[in-house]
């Protein structure tokens, strides 16, 4: 959202430079949304590991770096998931709806992009998005991945379903994906950050966890 809003402000002349930054912390997230580490609870296979990390992007009105060419603002999607240890499944429908809306609004097909990356769906959410597009007759194999799959070694580090948190997508985009764009390894990136409108109190009362997703297209070679 901050990347998208920053680009809007820049394009409308409200700002010459805008900073989009965020962070997350493992212990803080566990204590606030699940259980304190001292509790010693066993993590479920669907649980993800909140990234202790941060990332920042500087958006400018001019320059030669990668450009934000499209912004697709998502809408809330609620699949009825109530398990705070299965956030990937809770957020996946929102990612699917936003990506589908992006392709419909722009007239682009998935293969227009060199890489499509979601924020922090992890192994479970990534599989859900793949399946939803397969049901539409669209195969994203080899084209689509998720920051939660990229930031950790899932097997070697035993992080169960992968990484999560605001810092997950921010760190992967600022520290890895932008380098791919700048080096020319990829030229067109569709980045769809994911999130949840989650309240610990509502979750304890058994209420569902709605998801949200906003997408930005970042390109190094723009057709004019």
Predicted feature locations:
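Glycine-/charge-enriched secondary-structure boundary and capping motifs
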Residues: 143-168, 180
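A short, acidic, amphipathic alpha-helical segment used as a generic capping/interface helix at domain edges
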Residues: 99-104, 170-182
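Short glycine/threonine-rich loop-to-helix capping motif typified by GTGT followed
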Residues: 121-136, 201-208
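Single conserved hydrophobic/aromatic residue that forms the stacking wall/gate
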Residues: 1-9
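Flexible, glycine-rich active-site loops centered on histidine and acidic residues
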Residues: 16-50
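Long, repeat-rich segments with strong aromatic
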Residues: 100-130
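Condensing-enzyme catalytic core mediating Claisen C-C bond formation in acyl metabolism
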Residues: 36-100, 105-108, 138-149, 155, ...
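Short, well-ordered, mixed-charge alpha-helical segments that flank or form enzyme active sites
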Residues: 26-31, 76-80, 125, 198-200
